[in-house]
């Protein structure tokens, strides 16, 4: 009995703290015809039944007594309407009264199915479609406040700012505010700082009235280094062995977007000279990044970011000095901290008292002296390293942070880099490479340190018996292609792992003058391809050779080359001298899309973001089997749902989603956007996206909602699929699983339809190739696998295909 009263008392106290309220969402609208059997109306509250005095139900303001198809359950908190008909429509209300006479009430509107607009049933009561409550924008930009609602027309709208009425074409701010009574959006152009405030829209129709409040924050355009803050600078974290630790760090970021890095300082003894030096390691630490509500933004603006770094199952090697670093090209800020064992807690934070712990102090004085010397030395080394990094950043005028920007699982291999003259820095870099490591995809080769005679590079990699082969098992045939740092050969392989006998393969290797970053990319690509696994629609890893002085990657060979060239060679151009090797049908084109969608669905299930889905990165194998290439450098997102690109380089602009273009945020949903562009390429037989549109105009057009028109010979279903992939809000785009279902249905419809009766594709104008804009470490994409030949064809884009990130930002400012 006493325990029961304790429970009631606790529940009563919780109600007193949080207030009497319903446990389900508030008022909502129901339509007859949605369910053929019954409807449940829920008025459950956060209060024990013993403390509820009564519950009153009404129908159209009349108390519900005994009705044949209406029953109450759970002490009257739920109402069930069974086999309801049109006379059951109307407004239902419930009022819950507690023992202390406090009460709450809510309403439910059941609308008859006969209230329609055309042939489509509509909601009569008003409901806001977009519930965004915070908008952040930069001065001089344009801002649209969206109050679009669902409900019966006509809908009247009233706008209020800071309790002051805004009239249509108002002179509140020199006619910068504009809206139409029939257009439920308020537009503000040429934003000023005084445009910030609380905006309220009030919507009303004959069925009721609702309001929606939005907070608008306006910031000046800032170019500054990021600011790192935490609860306590130079904080010390005390933990025991086996415990987990989370280190929270807060960053205020301005333009350009910052890069994040966690560094660990430790001592390392040279096996040759027995000399001990301080070393700096970039940590593969798992983390979670959150953009705080205060800093959410629509364009380029100030951002308030929280990063939680996770140290799991603390061991001896985790204790020591750490420094978090956030920076951009304008500078950097750091947050140093220590992780120590709890046995040092009293002696470090609270100096020992002479009377009570003098004995303990004497016993540990020697140990503490050693620790003090080590810690002091580490801090001195850390300061020196920070100075060196700062000096390099100043000289190069570019951020050189090698941002992990993803989560890591466990180091598999260690690359020890000995870059020659260590006296200049006094630091040996040790970089861990793991199965989920994915390094830079885009880079400028001129900014990388080349490995030459003065910079010897020692590489130690443990062989993996499941993949390792000897060079004697490979016999190269001819050069398929090469880029700035790598080559790909066609070869004959014997007795590869899990495959006996002889087969034709592609072998990738680095050039002699490759740089440090290329080597890291190469190793990480191997590990990613190992960890992802095999699928029929991706380019699969077959073997690796790493123990005979050089690194080689052996992958499947696709003799038809990349999909873009394959489609161009087989497009139905009506010319006398045209030679078409294969007649492409509508069934084939749909099958190509379906195969790529299946491959991408597999990569998405492995939490991998490709970031460059395009026809040039899809290879065509035997039987016209589609294989997605260049996913070895895709980003792994096992612990978070997005990846923010933080390095400079050339970008495939025309294939990038809006959020990737303007915020450099990549998700599986941004891959969906790129897949829509790929589908457009396939339907147009390798056409160039956004034909005739200059890149400097493309950004503005995309922000205004422009999408490519339906191309020639494209079905309605396929074009609808493309438009769904190009929706501005990422969450509104379909998943790859949904795309597979749609494409399988289209494939059935196209099983007997060919392109015989379709109009021919006009030849494109000759494209002038520029310097390689996309020379990534993976050379297995684009034109390296040539059809029936081994001619050299260096990777390159047309001028329209790629832009640097600086170009994107400048274009964004020009149209903002």
Swiss-Prot record:
Task performed by this protein: Receptor for basic fibroblast growth factor.
Transmembrane segments: 371-391
Gene name of this polypeptide: FGFR
Active site per the UniProt annotation: 612
This protein's name: Fibroblast growth factor receptor
Compartments (UniProt record): Membrane
Similarity comment: family membership: Belongs to the protein kinase superfamily. Tyr protein kinase family. Fibroblast growth factor receptor subfamily.
This enzyme's EC code(s): 2.7.10.1
